[in-house]
C-alpha cells in the first residue's frame, strides 16, 4: 500500500533521501517548497514527487490518509544568532505546522528547528501537543549531528516516532575533506550564510565558518610548546628544511606554524554535502520549470540549501523508529 508522505518546507528533499536509505519505495511524496533552487535540485532527483509550492497549501491534502508529516520550519525567527522574535517574526511558520498537524492527523510526524530560548521551545511544544489533542507534552529531543557526521550541528526534533539510543559513528572532519589539513575533529556548524565565506578572525575569535588549511606541501615534523589551538602548535618542514618558528607578540592569535605562509580555504560544496551526509554532488544540478531543462547550481545556492538542510544520517536514524518501515 502506498504511503503518503507530506514534507512542509521540503528544501532539497532531505526527508526523501532519508526514506531512500530505509528502502522506502512505496511512498507518494508530497513536497511543499518555494525556494526555486532547492526545489530544482529536488525535482532533478525526484521527478515523480507531487509539488504544491508554498507550505500554506497543506490544505490540498485534507481528507487524505497522511502516513508521515515532516518539516524543518524556518529557523531564523528562533536562532540565537538572529533577532529571535519567534512568532513575532513574519517568517515564522510554527502556527502553520500546528494547523497542518491538527488538520491532517498523520500517523507519524517529525519537525525540526534550532536550539532556542526555553520559552520559545515551550510554546512550540505546547502548540504541537494541543494540535495532537493530548495532555502529554511532546517534548523535543536534542541531537547533535556530530554523532552521525563530521559536523557539529545541534538541532531540536519534535516527533512521535520512538528514537532508539545511538552510538557515535566516529566520522571526523579529516575523513571528508578533499585535500588540505584541518585542526579539529568536528566542523563548526555550516549555516545558510556559509557562501559569504570565512576568515581567520571569524574562525578563531567567533568559532564560525569552518576553514581548511593548505600547507603547500609541508609535512609536520613536531609541535611547538605554545598555548592555544593545535593549528598554531605545529612545526612543518618544506624541501627538507625546518624553518625557524616565528615569534610575535599578541597572545594565541599571533604565533604561527613554521611555514613561510599558511594558506586557508573554505569548505567546498562537496565537503558540505559530506558534512550533511548528503550523496556526493547531489546539489550540483537542478531541473528548472521555467527553462524546462537541467542546469548547474551555483556554489552560493548549494551552500545555502545545505546550510538550511538536514543531516541525512540523523533523519534516517529517527525514521527507522517507524514500526512499519
PLM features per residue range, with description:
Residues 1-5:
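Extreme N-terminal starter segment of soluble prokaryotic enzymes
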Residues 8-13:
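Class I SAM-dependent methyltransferase "Motif I" SAM/SAH-binding loop
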Residues 22-27:
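Conserved S-adenosyl-L-methionine
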Residues 31-36, 112-113:
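Conserved acidic E/D residue at the C-terminus of a beta-strand in Rossmann-like folds
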Residues 42:
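Conserved SAM-binding loop
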Residues 48-54:
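Conserved SAM-binding strand-loop segment of SAM-dependent methyltransferases
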Residues 58-68, 73-250, 259-265:
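Class I S-adenosyl-L-methionine
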Amino acid at each position: 500500500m502506498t504511503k503518503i508522505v507530506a514534507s512542509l518546507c521540503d528544501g532539497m528533499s532531505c526527508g526523501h533521501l532519508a526514506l531512500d536509505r530505509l528502502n522506502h519505495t512505496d511512498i507518494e511524496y508530497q513536497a511543499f517548497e518555494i525556494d526555486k533552487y532547492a526545489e530544482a535540485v529536488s525535482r532533478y532527483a525526484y521527478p515523480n514527487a507531487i509539488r504544491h509550492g508554498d507550505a500554506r497549501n497543506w490544505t490540498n491534502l485534507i481528507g487524505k490518509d497522511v502516513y508521515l508529516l515532516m518539516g524543518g520550519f524556518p529557523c531564523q525567527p528562533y536562532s540565537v544568532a538572529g533577532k529571535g522574535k519567534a512568532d513575532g517574526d513574519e517568517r515564522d511558520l510554527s502556527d502553520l505546522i500546528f494547523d497542518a498537524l491538527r488538520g491532517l492527523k498523520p500517523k507519524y510526524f517529525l519537525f525540526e528547528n534550532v536550539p532556542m530560548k526555553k520559552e520559545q521551545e515551550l510554546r512550540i511544544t505546547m502548540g504541537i501537543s494541543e494540535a495532537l489533542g493530548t495532555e502529554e507534552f511532546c517534548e523535543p529531543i536534542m541531537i547533535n549531528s556530530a554523532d552521525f557526521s563530521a559536523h557539529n550541528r545541534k538541532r531540536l526534533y519534535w516527533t512521535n516516532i520512538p528514537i532508539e539510543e545511538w552510538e557515535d559513528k566516529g566520522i571526523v572532519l579529516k575523513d571528508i575533506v578533499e585535500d588540505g589539513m584541518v585542526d579539529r575533529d568536528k566542523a563548526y556548524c555550516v549555516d545558510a550564510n556559509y557562501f559569504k565565506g570565512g576568515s581567520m578572525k571569524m574562525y578563531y575569535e567567533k568559532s564560525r565558518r569552518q576553514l581548511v588549511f593548505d600547507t603547500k606541501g609541508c609535512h609536520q615534523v613536531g609541535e611547538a610548546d605554545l598555548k592555544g589551538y593545535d593549528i598554531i602548535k605545529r612545526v612543518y618542514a618544506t624541501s627538507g628544511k625546518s624553518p625557524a618558528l616565528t615569534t610575535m607578540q599578541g597572545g594565541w592569535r599571533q604565533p604561527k606554524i613554521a611555514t613561510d605562509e599558511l594558506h586557508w580555504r573554505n569548505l567546498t560544496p562537496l565537503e558540505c554535502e559530506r558534512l550533511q551526509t548528503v550523496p556526493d554532488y547531489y546539489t550540483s544540478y537542478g531541473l528548472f520549470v521555467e527553462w524546462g531543462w537541467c542546469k548547474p547550481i551555483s556554489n552560493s545556492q548549494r551552500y545555502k540549501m545545505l546550510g538550511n538542510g538536514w543531516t541525512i544520517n540523523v533523519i534516517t536514524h529517527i525514521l527507522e523508529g517507524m514500526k512499519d518501515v
